[in-house]
């Protein structure tokens, strides 16, 4: 059994890879990371494959434990090329590992398709992948929560509470004004990305992932999609990153 591990800024997710199939996802706070946890939950693994966007101390601790337990350990990094995927970055290692693995995961699921990938988490990223595996680059925007807190932190006169229900309606109070504008701005960026991508060639599929990806998928599907893409080709894929990590197994 191989463990695929995604270490985020505050939380870690992992899945088991058994005979080519991914298990359900387990999540934990990074504060729970310890040798005791590893021994309890990871000691049956033959290999750990890790992606990390957090402090290196977490992976250092995990690598040390693996060495002691004689378990194979591999931390993956963004590259210029992997399989058929070619990075658009002039300095490939500076592409976020989460974006790199989302691109790899997309090729794993949908080879030889032109795909627009939107990952909506701490940041909302857009990446265009063409059918020959060429990454065409993308955009990075502050995530929904970051947009919200940025407005409040730069104005002492705006008082609003974050709401979990996304809406594009014009608000009749400050909280709705701020919340709905954050969703509208993000959706507007996505729609502009779709238009720009289509100018470069036909798009076969739009994939959304990340913590806010499901809500954005619903908002996107609620808009007029006739000129965007067939509804069945606009989809949310939870934990797309693990399909990318699987390529390193």
Curated annotation (Swiss-Prot):
<keyword id="KW-0418">Kinase</keyword>
<feature type="active site" description="Proton acceptor">
    <location>
        <position position="98"/>
    </location>
</feature>
<feature type="binding site">
    <location>
        <position position="122"/>
    </location>
    <ligand>
        <name>ATP</name>
    </ligand>
</feature>
<dbReference type="GO" id="GO:0005524">
    <property type="term" value="F:ATP binding"/>
</dbReference>
<dbReference type="GO" id="GO:0046872">
    <property type="term" value="F:metal ion binding"/>
</dbReference>
<comment type="subunit">
    <text>Homodimer.</text>
</comment>
<keyword id="KW-0630">Potassium</keyword>
<keyword id="KW-0479">Metal-binding</keyword>
<feature type="binding site">
    <location>
        <position position="119"/>
    </location>
    <ligand>
        <name>K(+)</name>
    </ligand>
</feature>
<dbReference type="Pfam" id="PF03309">
    <property type="entry name" value="Pan_kinase"/>
</dbReference>
<keyword id="KW-0808">Transferase</keyword>
<keyword id="KW-0963">Cytoplasm</keyword>
<dbReference type="GO" id="GO:0005737">
    <property type="term" value="C:cytoplasm"/>
</dbReference>
<keyword id="KW-0547">Nucleotide-binding</keyword>
<feature type="binding site">
    <location>
        <begin position="6"/>
        <end position="13"/>
    </location>
    <ligand>
        <name>ATP</name>
    </ligand>
</feature>
<comment type="function">
    <text>Catalyzes the phosphorylation of pantothenate (Pan), the first step in CoA biosynthesis.</text>
</comment>
<feature type="binding site">
    <location>
        <position position="174"/>
    </location>
    <ligand>
        <name>substrate</name>
    </ligand>
</feature>
<comment type="pathway">
    <text>Cofactor biosynthesis; coenzyme A biosynthesis; CoA from (R)-pantothenate: step 1/5.</text>
</comment>
<feature type="binding site">
    <location>
        <position position="89"/>
    </location>
    <ligand>
        <name>substrate</name>
    </ligand>
</feature>
<keyword id="KW-0067">ATP-binding</keyword>
<keyword id="KW-0173">Coenzyme A biosynthesis</keyword>
<dbReference type="InterPro" id="IPR043129">
    <property type="entry name" value="ATPase_NBD"/>
</dbReference>
<feature type="binding site">
    <location>
        <begin position="96"/>
        <end position="99"/>
    </location>
    <ligand>
        <name>substrate</name>
    </ligand>
</feature>
<comment type="similarity">
    <text>Belongs to the type III pantothenate kinase family.</text>
</comment>
<dbReference type="GO" id="GO:0004594">
    <property type="term" value="F:pantothenate kinase activity"/>
</dbReference>
<protein>
    <recommendedName>
        <fullName>Type III pantothenate kinase</fullName>
        <ecNumber>2.7.1.33</ecNumber>
    </recommendedName>
</protein>
<dbReference type="InterPro" id="IPR004619">
    <property type="entry name" value="Type_III_PanK"/>
</dbReference>
<dbReference type="GO" id="GO:0015937">
    <property type="term" value="P:coenzyme A biosynthetic process"/>
</dbReference>
């Amino acid at each position: 059994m191989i463990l695929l591990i995604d270490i985020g800024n505050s939380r870690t997710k992992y899945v088991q890879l058994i005979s080519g199939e991914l298990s359900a996802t387990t999540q934990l706070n990074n504060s729970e990371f310890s040798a005791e946890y590893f021994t309890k939950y990871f000691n049956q693994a033959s290999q750990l494959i890790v992606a990390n966007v957090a402090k290196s101390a977490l992976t250092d601790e995990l690598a040390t434990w693996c060495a002691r337990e004689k378990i194979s350990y591999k931390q993956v990094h963004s590259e210029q090329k992997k399989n058929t995927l070619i990075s658009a970055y002039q300095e490939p290692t500076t592409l976020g590992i989460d974006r790199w693995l989302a691109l790899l995961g997309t090729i794993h699921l949908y080879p030889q398709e032109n795909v627009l990938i939107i990952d909506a988490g701490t940041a909302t990223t857009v990446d265009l992948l063409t059918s020959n595996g060429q990454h065409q680059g993308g955009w990075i925007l502050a995530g929904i929560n970051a947009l919200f807190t940025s407005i409040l932190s730069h104005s002492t006169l705006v008082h609003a509470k974050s709401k979990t229900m996304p809406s594009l309606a014009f608000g009749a109070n400050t909280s709705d004004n701020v919340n709905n504008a954050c969703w509208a701005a993000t959706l507007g960026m996505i729609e502009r990305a779709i238009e720009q991508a289509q100018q470069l060639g036909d798009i076969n599929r739009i994939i959304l992932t990340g913590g806010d990806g499901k809500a954005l998928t619903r908002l996107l599907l609620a808009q007029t999609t006739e000129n965007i893409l067939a509804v069945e080709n606009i989809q949310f894929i939870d934990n797309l990153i693990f399909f990318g990590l699987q390529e390193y197994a």
